């Protein structure tokens, strides 16, 4: 039987060394994770393990950030499944990353190697090996978590039985790399960055991280939604139309973005933000596999794809490309929402339907009835 963490509690697991795709070595890696539900293994070696992949600034506590979808009787039913979510390699919520201790006793900082999505998945595979899990019923995730899910399907089809890929593309586009590189530049131009070695200085590059979050958050939401919510309204008690520009006299949307920035700065590490954003820039399912379409066609496990109709970060046509070229497409679903990219996190009713459909399609004999499935191919 696997050695699993107590239910719902943060735990860590040593997984040994990781050799990155680019050739760097990360010794003695730790992966943090949460687990819900009891592990079951069938006579044929299949299991009830569901692996959830979090997005860029997420963490392993999926029952918190996907609270409407993970739990007893919910779409990701912890009465039926053993649900596991890890904190990604390079993160800052328990897994080894730039803010972790280096073997020499200092911080990794700028010495932490560049990683890509495949390195993240390799670390998760070593994590599963370390705790004694050899088969996974399903892996699923959105955005950066969707990129990892897609790589799981390509790298380890003998381990994963099915996958649900949400709100992501087969590779980073020039548009995405440009947006994400601007965020990295905002952090690296903060005078507290110190080339990534700020951990012992007592000063974090908070302004740079906040600026990066403002840029990113606009791509996570829908243009019409933002305009309908804020328009050209001033923030209450402030006047952005005065005779001189003053930073403390803001439009309402500026105040909203300030709030989003402040929240992230309090909970996330700038070094991890740079590391993980760079990993997203490197995302390319076709690299070394004969190109995008050939790589997608070679994926043999059943894959469900879902996207958001108003997503400006990972536009819906990118999920259509996935669906047209995957070797074993299970289904295609569209999330209809003014919210944009974040809809896979916020549109709980639609996501509930999509995920219940996913599990009913891969487990037709289980007590997990489907409502209906939509195909947009």
Swiss-Prot record:
PANTHER family: HOMOSERINE O-ACETYLTRANSFERASE
Biological pathway: Amino-acid biosynthesis; L-methionine biosynthesis via de novo pathway; O-acetyl-L-homoserine from L-homoserine: step 1/1
Molecular function via GO: homoserine O-acetyltransferase activity
Main function: Transfers an acetyl group from acetyl-CoA to L-homoserine, forming acetyl-L-homoserine.
GO terms of biological process kind: homoserine metabolic process; methionine biosynthetic process
Gene: metXA
UniProt keyword list: Acyltransferase, Amino-acid biosynthesis, Cytoplasm, Methionine biosynthesis, Transferase
Known partners and oligomeric status: Homodimer.
Catalytic activity: L-homoserine + acetyl-CoA = O-acetyl-L-homoserine + CoA
UniProt name for this protein: Homoserine O-acetyltransferase
Pfam families listed in its UniProt record: Abhydrolase_1 (PF00561)
Record-annotated active site: 143 (nucleophile), 311, 341
Class of the enzyme per the UniProt entry, highest EC level: transferase
Gene Ontology CC annotations of this record: cytoplasm
Gene3D superfamilies linked to this entry: alpha/beta hydrolase (3.40.50.1820)
Protein's cellular compartments: Cytoplasm
Organism, scientific name: Corynebacterium efficiens (strain DSM 44549 / YS-314 / AJ 12310 / JCM 11189 / NBRC 100395)
């Amino acid at each position: 039987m696997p050695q699993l963490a107590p239910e719902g509690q943060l735990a860590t697991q040593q997984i040994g060394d990781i050799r990155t795709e680019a050739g760097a070595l990360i010794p003695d890696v730790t992966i943090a994770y949460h687990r819900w539900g009891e592990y079951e293994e069938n006579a044929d070696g299949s299991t009830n393990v569901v692996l959830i992949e979090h997005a860029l600034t997420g963490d392993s506590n999926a029952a918190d950030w996907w609270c409407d979808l993970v739990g007893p009787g919910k779409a990701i039913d912890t009465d039926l499944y053993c649900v596991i979510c890890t904190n990604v390699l390079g993160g800052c919520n328990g897994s080894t990353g730039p803010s972790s201790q280096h073997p020499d006793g200092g911080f990794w900082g700028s010495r932490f190697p560049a990683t890509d999505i495949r390195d993240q998945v390799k670390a998760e595979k070593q994590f599963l090996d370390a705790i004694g899990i050899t088969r996974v019923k399903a892996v699923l995730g959105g955005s950066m978590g969707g990129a990892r899910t897609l790589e799981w399907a390509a790298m380890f089809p003998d381990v994963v039985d099915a996958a649900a890929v949400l709100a992501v593309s087969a590779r980073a586009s020039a548009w995405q790399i440009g947006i994400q590189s601007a965020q990295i530049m905002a952090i690296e131009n903060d005078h507290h960055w110190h080339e990534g070695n700020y951990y012992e200085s007592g000063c974090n590059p908070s302004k740079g991280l906040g600026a990066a979050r403002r840029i990113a958050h606009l791509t996570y939401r829908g243009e019409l939604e933002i305009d309908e919510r804020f328009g050209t309204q001033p923030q209450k008690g402030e006047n952005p139309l005065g005779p001189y520009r003053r930073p403390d006299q803001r439009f309402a949307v500026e105040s909203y973005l300030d709030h989003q920035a402040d929240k992230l700065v309090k909970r996330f590490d700038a070094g991890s933000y740079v590391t993980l954003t760079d990993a997203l820039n490197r995302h390319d399912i076709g690299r070394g596999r004969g190109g995008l379409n050939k790589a997608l066609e070679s994926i043999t496990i059943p894959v469900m794809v879902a996207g958001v109709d108003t997503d400006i970060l990972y536009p819906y046509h990118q999920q259509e490309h996935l669906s047209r070229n995957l070797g074993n497409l299970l289904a295609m679903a569209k999330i209809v929402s003014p919210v944009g990219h974040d809809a896979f996190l916020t549109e709980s009713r639609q996501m509930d339907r999509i995920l219940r459909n996913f599990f009913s399609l891969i487990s037709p004999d289980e007590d997990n009835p489907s409502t209906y499935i939509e195909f947009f191919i």
